[in-house]
């Protein structure tokens, strides 16, 4: 999912049944420090929650009330060139629509309802990218924006700038080419860049992109602590994806895996179990 952090320093602990008191902007920095706390990035804006679909503003609000302040979201483009939140090429899995996203205009898409990960229809609508940004604008939250292949980077940037949300967005990249292109377009914005191994680390160090504009995504396979320390030595935060099998494994081990990864040097957990991970890493 930046120098998102002085990573959430000194969060007050509350009973899990209560609304969590979120960290303020003043307590957040995306530059690595040994004083940082770890935090969670909700994959697809929150998944695996009964009654709350992925890439849904109401899900963001639900998780925000539980202490989640980082949301990885997917931005796609409709037939009439409008930006919406949608992971798949097709509307079918996560909404009552059946067509491909690029075959339907926004007016039609707004007639559909979102479906949760258990196949249950909700009353929630598919949000536009602008609507999602507007929700987050008044809150100490951050979006990690995963841009679908058909979407023009310039349209993404224009929407972010119109919302004045440049400081609350991290743009997700998967290749050094994408990272260079986006950095050239918006040199002041943060980028999530791939650093899964020594080769990718060296490529990024020689890319010309300042390290203070990087957050390192180290993949979904566990790296050794020495490699993560090398990233930290550049004052770059480490994001690790526990999506899929690792989240499933952790759920059977009382969250011990997350604590082990924390000791390894993981700063940001990209996860499908946002609430569980947040509670685990914030226990006394």
Which residue ranges define each predicted feature?
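Phosphate-group recognition and catalysis centered on beta-loop-alpha active-site segments
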Residues: 10-284
